[in-house]
């Protein structure tokens, strides 16, 4: 486990130092584009930074590179209001945090495209491949059917048992994640759980979870680093090379796993059950998908959980311990509805307190708090003209704290005491490009939390809360793991039920 942490921290540190060193050089090179561009001036009337003889676009773009996408979005919405206009890599970009504007974009077929650096997407294999950033709509619709089939129906029903089994498996070897002081590396525990779940549901072949997690972390760091970089960044081979190698490392590993799966299928006398990877391989055999399509789809299915669901669970455990009354209510609900047995699919709809807790956690401290889209045709949003090709960033996290909720800046289950209209709460998006895994994500979250909380109460280090730990907000909200020991927690068997933390009952506010 120390190797996982060391590899992750060293790679992330190298990424940060390199990007900071290059920012000045890259922005100077962009000057030529700035002063020769014809369509960068504000034609829409949306509030935002001024042109300033071409310095406005440079300054706004540099802020995104420097602060990260999520943090920069919050900065501009705070400064200019719920609809703000900036420039990213020379392209006019609207940042929306008003519910009416966000809902309009989510529900419309005009905004099913996504924007990012073409070369950046090519680096990570997402340019016109996979499902996450694929803007080849014909191919996207085709592969989405495979994701939908795997993430709904029988796959959804099966996920509860798989989550229970995978969680218990890792909890039974908790000592492998525990240091000499008795603190558990909870982030990597959760990552191992969700990788195991993903493999059992979608790939079903033997793999080294910890080794794969190292590669996933490097890939994710590369994804964040290259997503909105200018083209010149990719010409600097002495810098770009390590990102290219990190992405290729996971792509090659996924290629090997897919080939291993293919051989396993060929060696079967009878195929009683199919899964996500099997369906994709059959599609390739019928020339419906390419080898690269299959590899990228499997890659995206496998990486989706470790750096979204696992981090969400981590934040939820922190919030739970900051709100001990809520933890008490959840545990009592589990005991009354489930008792000593394992949770089953039919139990989930009975766990109302847990449901409200998860929703409030996703609202109050989301891992992914924005969505990137592109206008396919001219449109109008809340009275503002949106030209074809305009980029849009939907600042969902800020929207969740600025409208509708009675206590928007406080973690409080009363925010979900009554039904919340969908236009005001969109943790997974909605409409034609909604997150295809939104239903299974909720099921997995519930199953893992119930299994874990039935056995243990989790105690973070003193002073470790969602508002005090260091975090970055670029592609997603991530705890900074420079000192992973500070993020470790004690796992105390539920029968003992003591943490020794004098601040357990404090209200959580931001």
Swiss-Prot record:
Top EC group: oxidoreductase
One of the GO biological process terms: lipid metabolic process
Keyword Chaperone appears in the UniProt entry: no
Main location: membrane
GO molecular function, one term: aromatase activity
Mode of membrane association: Peripheral membrane protein
Compartments where located: Membrane
Stored InterPro entries: Cyt_P450, Cyt_P450_CS, Cyt_P450_E_grp-I, Cyt_P450_sf, Cytochrome_P450_Monoox
Cofactor requirements of the protein: heme
GO cellular component, one term: endoplasmic reticulum
CDD domains: CYP19A1 (cd20616)
Catalysed reaction equations from the record: testosterone + 3 reduced [NADPH--hemoprotein reductase] + 3 O2 = 17beta-estradiol + formate + 3 oxidized [NADPH--hemoprotein reductase] + 4 H2O + 4 H(+); androst-4-ene-3,17-dione + 3 reduced [NADPH--hemoprotein reductase] + 3 O2 = estrone + formate + 3 oxidized [NADPH--hemoprotein reductase] + 4 H2O + 4 H(+)
Binding site for heme: 435
Tissue distribution: Brain specific.
Coiled coil regions, renumbered to chain: none
Enzyme Commission (EC) number: 1.14.14.14
SUPFAM superfamilies, alphabetized: Cytochrome P450
Job of this protein: Catalyzes the formation of aromatic C18 estrogens from C19 androgens.
Protein known as: Brain aromatase
Protein source organism: Carassius auratus (Goldfish)
Gene name of the record: cyp19a1
């Amino acid at each position: 486990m120390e190797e996982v942490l060391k590899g992750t921290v060293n790679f992330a540190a190298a990424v940060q130092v390199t990007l900071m060193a290059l920012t000045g050089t890259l922005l100077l090179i962009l000057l030529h584009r700035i002063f020769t561009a014809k369509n960068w001036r504000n034609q829409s009337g949306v509030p935002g930074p001024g042109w300033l003889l071409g310095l406005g676009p440079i300054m706004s773009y540099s802020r995104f590179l420097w602060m990260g996408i999520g943090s920069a979005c919050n900065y501009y919405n705070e400064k200019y209001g719920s609809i703000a206009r900036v420039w990213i890599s020379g392209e006019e970009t609207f940042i929306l945090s008003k519910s009416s504007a966000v809902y309009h974009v989510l529900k419309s077929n005009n905004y099913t495209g996504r924007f990012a650096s073409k070369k950046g997407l090519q680096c990570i294999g997402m340019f016109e491949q996979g499902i996450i950033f694929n803007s080849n709509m014909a191919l996207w619709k085709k592969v989405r059917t495979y994701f939908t089939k795997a993430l709904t129906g029988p796959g959804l029903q099966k996920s509860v048992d798989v989550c229970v089994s995978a969680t218990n498996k890792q909890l039974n070897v908790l000592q492998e994640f525990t240091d000499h002081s008795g603190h558990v590396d909870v982030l990597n525990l959760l990552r191992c759980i969700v990788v195991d779940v993903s493999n059992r549901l979608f790939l079903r072949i033997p793999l080294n979870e910890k080794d794969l997690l190292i590669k996933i972390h490097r890939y994710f760091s590369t994804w964040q680093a290259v997503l909105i970089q200018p083209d010149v960044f990719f010409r600097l081979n002495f810098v770009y090379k390590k990102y290219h190698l990190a992405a290729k490392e996971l792509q090659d590993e996924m290629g090997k796993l897919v080939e291993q799966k293919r051989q396993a299928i060929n060696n079967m006398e009878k195929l009683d059950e199919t899964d996500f990877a099997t369906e994709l391989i059959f599609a390739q055999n019928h020339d419906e998908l390419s080898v690269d399509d299959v590899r990228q789809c499997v890659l995206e299915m496998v990486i989706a959980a470790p750096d979204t669901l696992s981090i969400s669970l981590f934040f939820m455990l922190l919030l739970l311990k900051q709100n001990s009354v809520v933890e008490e209510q959840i545990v009592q609900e589990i005991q009354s509805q489930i008792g000593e047995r394992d949770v089953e699919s039919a139990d989930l709809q009975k766990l109302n307190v847990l449901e409200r807790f998860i929703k409030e956690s996703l609202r109050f401290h989301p891992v992914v708090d924005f969505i990137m889209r592109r206008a396919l045709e001219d449109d109008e949003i809340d009275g503002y003209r949106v030209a074809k090709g305009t980029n849009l960033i939907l600042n969902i996290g800020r929207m969740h704290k600025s409208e509708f909720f009675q206590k928007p800046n406080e973690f409080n289950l009363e925010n979900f005491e009554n039904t919340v209209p969908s236009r005001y709460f969109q943790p997974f998006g909605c409409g034609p490009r909604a997150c295809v895994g939104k239903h299974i994500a909720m099921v997995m979250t519930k199953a893992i939390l119930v299994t874990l909380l039935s056995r243990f109460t989790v105690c973070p280090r003193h002073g470790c809360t969602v508002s005090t730990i260091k975090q970055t907000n670029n592609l997603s909200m991530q705890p900074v793991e420079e000192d992973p020991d500070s993020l470790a927690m004690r796992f105390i068997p539920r029968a003992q039920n003591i943490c020794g933390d004098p601040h357990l009952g404090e209200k959580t506010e931001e």
